[in-house]
C-alpha cells in the first residue's frame, strides 16, 4: 500500500511539474517582454531577492521556476508600497518535498 501511495504521489508531482513548465512557457507577459528585449535572459533574479521591477525574471529552482511574490508594505509615514521577492509557492514546496521523500525511499 505504501508503494502505491508513493508512486501515485510521484505521478502527481511529475504531472504538476510538466503542467507548470507548459504554463510558464506560455505566459503572455513573459513572451511580450522577451520579444521587447530581443535577447535571451542570461541574468535572472535569485531566490529571496527583490523582483519588484522585473516580475517575470526569477531564476529556476531545482524543479520549478521561482515566482515573484508581492506584498504591500506600509511605511511609518503611512505610505503603501508594493515589495516583491522571488520565492517558491507552497504547492511547489509540497511537490519538491514529495520528490525528495521518494528519492530517499527509492535511492
From Swiss-Prot:
Key words of the record: Disulfide bond, Knottin, Secreted, Signal, Toxin
Species whose genome carries this gene: Lycosa singoriensis (Wolf spider)
This protein's name: U1-lycotoxin-Ls1u
GO cellular component, one term: extracellular region
Tissue and organ expression note: Expressed by the venom gland.
Domain notes from UniProt: The presence of a 'disulfide through disulfide knot' structurally defines this protein as a knottin.
Mitochondrion keyword on record: no
Cystine connections: 44-59, 51-68, 58-86, 70-84
One Pfam family per UniProt: Toxin_35
PROSITE patterns from the UniProt entry: SPIDER_CSTX
Domain of life: Eukaryota
Amino acid at each position: 500500500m505504501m508503494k502505491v501511495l508513493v508512486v501515485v504521489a510521484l505521478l502527481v508531482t511529475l504531472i504538476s511539474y510538466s503542467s507548470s513548465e507548459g504554463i510558464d512557457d506560455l505566459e503572455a507577459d513573459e513572451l511580450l517582454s522577451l520579444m521587447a528585449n530581443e535577447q535571451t535572459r542570461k541574468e535572472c533574479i535569485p531566490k529571496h531577492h527583490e523582483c519588484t521591477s522585473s516580475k517575470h525574471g526569477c531564476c529556476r529552482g531545482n524543479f520549478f521556476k521561482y515566482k515573484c511574490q508581492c506584498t504591500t508594505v506600509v511605511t511609518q509615514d503611512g505610505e503603501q508600497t508594493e515589495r516583491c521577492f522571488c520565492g517558491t509557492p507552497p504547492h511547489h514546496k509540497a511537490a519538491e518535498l514529495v520528490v525528495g521523500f521518494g528519492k530517499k525511499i527509492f535511492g
